[in-house]
Amino acid sequence: MNTIPTRCLLGGLLALSLLAYAGEGDGTQHIVIDSGDTARSWEAARQSQEQWNATHGLRNKVNTRVEKDFDRYDQAVDLQEKCNSSQNVNAYWEPNTSRCLDRRTGRSLLAP
């Protein structure tokens, strides 16, 4: 006796639930395919390249300066050893100026 209204009620509920489910997803599902060639990505890549170039240039300057300082120090050590082992009795090493000087005249000795 109650089977027909129950079946109609269940069928109606099923139809309503399917309509409600189908209506929810209509406006929210979007598929965006981007090749990465947008203006924003080009600008970000350009800025990244500029920053890399700037840091690379600064690193090169720092490395060049360090090499020059090392070469100066290395040359000063060589001159000091040469001055201290010199046969000239009047030759002495001046550490403040990193030069080999003559005790009598105070002049720089080119070849100690």
From Swiss-Prot:
Keyword Chloroplast: no
Superkingdom of this protein's organism: Bacteria
Record has Signal as a keyword: yes
Chain coiled-coil ranges: none
Protein name in UniProt: UPF0482 protein SG1468
Signal peptide: 1-22
Keyword list, A-Z: Signal
Pfam families named in the record: DUF1283
Species annotation: Sodalis glossinidius (strain morsitans)
Organism placement in taxonomy: Bacteria, Pseudomonadati, Pseudomonadota, Gammaproteobacteria, Enterobacterales
InterPro entries: DUF1283
Similarity remark: Belongs to the UPF0482 family.
